[in-house]
Amino acid sequence: MFKFATAVILCLAASSTLAQHNPHWWGNRNTIVHLFEWKWSDIAAECENFLGPKGFAGVQVSPVNENIISAGRPWWERYQPISYKLITRSGNEQEFADMVRRCNDVGVRIYVDVLLNHMSGDFDGIAVGTAGSEAEPSKKSYPGVPYSAQDFHPSCEITDWNDRFQVQQCELVGLKDLDQSSEWVRSKLIEFLDHLIELGVAGFRVDAAKHMAADDLSYIYSTISDLNTEHGFPHNARPFIFQEVIDHGHETVSREEYNQLGAVTEFRFSEEIGNAFRGNNALKWLQSWGTGWGFLASGQALTFVDNHDNQRDMGAVLNYKSPKQYKMATAFHLAYPYGISRVMSSFAFDDHDTAPPQDEQERIISPEFDEEGACVNGWICEHRWRQIYAMVGFKNAVRDTELSNWWDNGDSQISFCRGNKGFLAVNNNLYDLSQELQTCLPAGVYCDVICGSLVDGSCTGKSVIVDDSGFGYIHIGSEDFDGVLALHVDARV
């Protein structure tokens, strides 16, 4: 009897963790956007006015719980919890709940960035949070939860990143490290996550997951509630979980410890796609992109060109400040059949600590748009760049098709088909791409969705004529604004 019961428990745990890889997208939608530091009311409006109509699948939102107030209001204060009250500069609980409902109503899921590893960093004296809660971080006292010193690991620094004990029990950049093996801590974290599930979220991005033991996270994930059916989720649906695990391939704490619990952020994807489109690697090598490069299995990998952390670091990672290469890399990301895709929506920054756009009272301001829909007041809004939202539509149009008919020039001009539904070509050389190429599309005239749109039966940008054999003449000049061309069946004239 005991062996049978144990087997049943193991089977249930396995099925539960597999379910945590399902993002619960509507229809053929399959791209998440990170609206970094946006207010809840603005996200609700964006879901209704832009994300839903453009076919985005979901939004990753900034941390929702009360955080410490830091001088100058740097973005990273959101990653220093004071309590689990749902009051931040993005809004209060009522505004958050309204946003979740309105986004779900138009088929856009909400994924919350959650902080289960730690509370705030050190602070002289009494710290005050965004909901007015007081805490004394130096004594590990957080009455708003409440947590006291016994709920944390003993203080120590991470000096050796190859020491598992230090990585998982010492303080990440001085942040007070919670003990997730404690029943009390587990109960408070589960209570917090369950409340968000009740409000209708579809899942969680788990910050600093590698700094928590996989066994502790497994317990927490398996104990939280099923998704709320009142928000359109099926019965017994589990929250989608994607975990921040930075693993460059030589880490003592590896991504493979977490990829069965949920998806994992594939940081090597970000680094290598940046290398390629910066010209440090020929694009021809991208034919084997994905697992052929040693990345995680497609359904386990949360993929991105940049995120809110690494876009601020020097190195190979691309960001909005290199727009041509960034748009090419994003087009490839969304066209190639690998990973669970997330695109970034940033605000402008001059240094690592730059605050989001705010007024004189340090209140986050709403994005404003020009006549073409681009943001103009400190918000970058890459997701509103035509070259990016058009590729979200491309990805929807080609969902569940295979890559075929790869072509390259032996260097950094490439093209490929997605079944008979889509075609992408990229030119990252310093000379023109002018070639008859197999598009795999039915005969007809197609709009290049990178440079224009299909409006009232005609293209606002350039078009490509595809013959009865599927071939079309493709031209991408070396000096062209975008360096990429994309055709799909939903943009046929």
From Swiss-Prot:
SUPFAM superfamilies: (Trans)glycosidases (SSF51445), Glycosyl hydrolase domain (SSF51011). It is found in: Secreted. Binds 1 Ca(2+) ion per subunit. Binds 1 Cl(-) ion per subunit. Residues 1-19 form the signal peptide. One of its GO terms (biological process) is carbohydrate metabolic process. Its main location: secreted. The modification Pyrrolidone carboxylic acid is found at residue 20. Disulfide bonds join 47-103, 156-170, 375-381, 417-440, 447-459. InterPro entries: A-amylase/branching_C, A-amylase_C, Alpha_amylase, Glyco_hydro_13_cat_dom, Glyco_hydro_b, Glycoside_hydrolase_SF. Monomer. This is Alpha-amylase-related protein.
